[in-house]
Amino acid sequence: MSIFSSLSSLSTGSLKSSVSSIENGSSSGSFGSNETSGWGQHHWNSCRPCPPPRPICRPCPPPCHPKPRCHY
């Protein structure tokens, strides 16, 4: 369980940097391709809890911050 906690912390850090890149528009070209369609801009804008079959959840960036969101 401690391994999962440390992974969550690492993921949160990298997620925040990814979010700031999206907000700045500097990496918008890398999103929306077939490989990363699950991480597209529309996905960041919709903050919703993870459905049961999707165990990999991560914190939302502001303004929806404490709600988790899924990546597919």
Swiss-Prot record:
Write out the biased-composition intervals (Low complexity). 1-38
The domain of life for this entry's organism is Eukaryota
Where is the stretch described as Disordered? 1-43
Name under which the protein is recorded: Putative uncharacterized protein DDB_G0285443
The source organism is: Dictyostelium discoideum
Lineage here is:
Eukaryota, Amoebozoa, Evosea, Eumycetozoa, Dictyostelia
